[in-house]
Amino acid sequence: MNALNYDKSLHIETEEIQVGFHKSYHYHRYEPTPYEHLEQLFREFPLRETDYVVDFGCGKGRLNFYIHYVFQSTVKGVEINEDFYYQALLNLEQYAKSRKKKKEKIHFYLGRAEDFLVQPEDNYFYFFNPFSLPIFQKIISNIVYSLEQNSRKVNIILYFPSDEYRFFMDNHALFKKKGEVKVGNRTEKDMFIIYQSLY
């Protein structure tokens, strides 16, 4: 199923790509993960209904709705752009209405990703190269702090990862690479890399 058909089926609108760039060089432009790549990822690494997934730089919420639709997991999206945040909320209304589903397992937060308070139940964290390395490092520090307070296994999913993200995670003392899923053939970066905590 192509992106427009997926969006139509879920009664959401996530396809449009941001034109131009964010006013801060720390934050990158919005571009949703292709649905066919999500299908490939989760065929190899399926989720459970009991999982809690946080998408940093969620945009209009494509990943959130896809995961909820397929796995019924709890999903949280963090977005700094007000327009995208309100589009995600509109998508949530349409999605819930069309599928007669309750909304309590889908959440969106407006604000800086590095200010998001990681909760004890959060166990998957998704990044599509949404911001600069210093912000990514701060978020990983927040996740590690949460693990120190509430020990558990967590997974970091990187899509189209930058060399800086990869180097940082490959050399992090508290995470190990769990696997890779290659998708598409545009570039060698066209992949997902999954890291798991050693806790």
Please place each PLM-identified region on the residue numbering.
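A short SAM/SAH-binding and catalytic strip from SAM-dependent methyltransferases
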Residues: 122-135
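Conserved SAM-binding motif I beta-strand of class I
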Residues: 74-79
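Conserved short alpha-helix immediately C-terminal to the canonical SAM/SAH-binding motif I
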Residues: 84
